[in-house]
């Protein structure tokens, strides 16, 4: 089968490898759509593992099922989680499923940028979701990123009538905007350095958009009657985004560290200025649990999140190198979908 083998952001090669063989309890998925995620381009995180087949935002059709698979059949339309928890360890029982050791060890074989992938037994048991007829394959690729956003806002304890600042208006930021708007918040400000994405932020529900080079705390105060943001969501890995977030959070508010940064970046905290008498909460989130996936899929099915308008590029598997360039440039683009069957 054809795969897109990742060597670096500038070197993604079409290669042929054997189609995975499945065993008892496993499923072979024919991949119909796979989204390029910004984390696919984190060379500091990916290069030491290369060469490898990336792609974790996937949807497709069951091409074969192993002995003992009971709840799914060949031809079923599905999306799948690449990481799944054990549901029995200390972390899972504490509600922190996405820091489970099992979750960190599970994955697809080989990855979503391939014509086919193998779903191991534990993924079949906990990480497969049947697609309703009204959800397309390309829409289903958003289940994974939306699940991550859901988990982040849950851990940040987002409440109705709060004010929200989203720093970085890429795909994750736009999903945060839409989900926060669905949650009944009073006010959303979004920032970015790209005008195209600021326009997208307004389109998807931000009340105010501001270029990230502006003095963000001052802009918030001007539009909220003097208050800062109750929740600040950092959807940019830039060090400047962290500084902006810490300066922009209201007393009693929360900063959610959602996007990863390069290694070595630290948080510039003045403990007294930030915490003493201010009750500021700093929190983070990683990934989504199977329960988050289920909620995300239902939101998409119900039309609560506008997915199709976020897809700006659709490409065949052989065009994935161009897809990586489009995502890396981050200009007139949002989500790039790869269709491995063409």
Label each PLM-derived region with a short phrase.
Residues 238-302, 339-342:
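Glycine-rich phosphate-binding loop and adjacent beta-alpha segment
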